[in-house]
Amino acid sequence: MWLLFVLFRGRRHGRLIFERIRGIPLVVFPEVFHPGLFLSTPLLLGAIEDLELETGSLVLDLGTGTGICAISIALKGARVTATDISTIAVRCARTNVLINNLEDRVRVLEGDLFQPVEKQRFDLVIFNPPYYEGKPGEWAGYAWRGENVLHRFAEGLGPHLTPKGRALLSVSTEVDLLTVKKGLQENGFETREIRKRWIPGETIYVYECRPSQICGHVRGEATSEAGQE
């Protein structure tokens, strides 16, 4: 992903840009991840558009960036809390919420992952994480690098979901997918691939994550029956 960015798309990064992505008008601040330059965001937006969601469902969008995922799901009738560790991204997302007249349905908070919503639970959590391990060197770096981000996401997810809640997670072969799945499994979640897109040198996925007792009860019954044979 990074190589494609450097070779073909870097000229549109680092500038104040007005875009319309999947019909949603956006302003992209210079130091904020541009959702139109990489496939992870469109893939995640496609999964969001296909969701069956009750009006008024509570949704958390982690690492919101421009706020496009939060806006997309708010347009489906959800009430959304969006968080980002970057002060500039928070300003950008709040601007886009205003542009789309969604102040009554989307609030944007500054903080790392679940920290701004410590005791709150949601019907759906959305996360398009940074794929590379390490400490960001600048605000723009938070879109690319994070310290144990996926591990901390897996640990924090359970306490922030309602009993039948779920998560949508965008991941790539740029990370160790087996480690990601293992981390979620160790924290009581099973993953199901719902989107997949190949690009040269990389495959991007969207996983649906649900508590194991919901996703796996049918599998557990089948295993028990097989053991009795």
Positions of PLM-derived features:
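N-terminal auxiliary segments of SAM/dcSAM-dependent transferases
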Residues: 1-19
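Conserved SAM-binding loop and adjacent beta-strand
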Residues: 11, 29-48, 53
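Conserved SAM/SAH cofactor-binding pocket of Class I
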Residues: 45-118, 124-127, 132-134
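Conserved hydrophobic residues forming the short capping helix/wall of the S-adenosyl-L-methionine
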Residues: 97, 157, 184
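Mobile active-site "lid"/loop adjacent to the S-adenosyl-L-methionine
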Residues: 127-152
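A short glycine-rich, Lys/Arg-flanked "PGG" loop and its adjoining helix->strand segment in the class I
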Residues: 147-163
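Conserved beta-strand signature within the Rossmann-like core of class I S-adenosyl-L-methionine
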Residues: 164-171
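Class I S-adenosyl-L-methionine
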Residues: 173-180, 184-221
